[in-house]
UniProtKB/Swiss-Prot annotation:
It comes from Drysdalia coronoides. GO terms for molecular function: acetylcholine receptor inhibitor activity; ion channel regulator activity; toxin activity. Expressed by the venom gland. One of its GO terms (cellular component) is extracellular region. This is Long neurotoxin 13. Keywords: Acetylcholine receptor inhibiting toxin, Disulfide bond, Ion channel impairing toxin, Neurotoxin, Postsynaptic neurotoxin, Secreted, Signal, Toxin. Disulfide bonds join C24-C42, C35-C63, C48-C52, C67-C78, C79-C84. The lineage of its organism: Eukaryota, Metazoa, Chordata, Craniata, Vertebrata. Belongs to the three-finger toxin family. Long-chain subfamily. Type II alpha-neurotoxin sub-subfamily.
């Protein structure tokens, strides 16, 4: 009887472990969600677009089976633990002074 009980416990643990899915943050909307079967990596992809100087880099978060390949202007980081791809925490770019205020600040 003890052997049967032990066997059931082992089978349950093995089955639960096989059904595990990675959780990663995803964009649009920004929230943690389970990844599809076979996608065991979380990634963060950043790049500059036409709004980069005002808003900072564009960000894409998601799941992948392999770390995504990058284009020359992109940066990608991959990780393999749950929710390891949080939204990057960087400072928003500050606008440069322009016009009359700029000339007053440049020449005290």
């Amino acid at each position: 009887m003890k052997t049967l009980l032990l066997t059931l416990v082992v089978v349950t643990i093995v089955c639960l472990d096989l059904a595990y899915t990675r959780k990663c943050y995803k964009t649009h909307p920004y929230k943690s969600e389970p990844c599809a079967s076979g996608e065991n990596l979380c990634y963060t992809k950043t790049w500059c677009d036409f709004r980069c100087s005002q808003l900072g880099k564009a960000v894409e978060l998601g799941c992948a089976a392999t770390c995504p390949t990058t284009k020359p202007y992109e940066e990608v980081t991959c990780c393999s633990t749950d929710d390891c791809n949080r939204f990057p925490n960087w400072e928003r770019p500050r606008p440069r002074p322009r016009g009359l205020l700029s000339s007053i600040m440049d020449h005290p």
